[in-house]
Amino acid sequence: MLRHAPRIHLNTVVLGELIGGFAAGTREAANRQSLSKFLDSPRVSLLDLTVDTADAYAQVWLGLRRKGQPIPSNDLWIAATALEHGAALLTLDSHFRQVDGLRVVERLADLLP
């Protein structure tokens, strides 16, 4: 799915989830090597969490709390990062659609002109 994306942004929370998954699997070294190659691509940028991300996190958390629709805390950080950067979120996790103002897409084709 990402092979054809002109630009890919991921935050450090997603990176942590990937590395954790690798550690729990049977191909950690190979997966880490593939990840390293992926991160070295000029198409890929790693977004750090900032004070602005934390502010966005608080707003997302509060909005979902008021609606009685909580989502996992890592996903709050992911949504907050996308909102902070004005980026669409490519995901199959439908609970992201509960986040006000977040553009969620399920197919890369929905992001391409």
Can you name each region flagged by the protein language model?
Residues 94:
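Conserved catalytic-core motifs of GNAT/GCN5-like acyltransferases
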Residues 90:
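Nucleic acid-binding interface residues in structured DNA/RNA-binding domains
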Residues 1-84, 98, 102, 106-110:
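PIN-domain endoribonuclease scaffold, especially VapC-family toxins
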Residues 87:
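Short glycine/serine/threonine/alanine-rich loop segments
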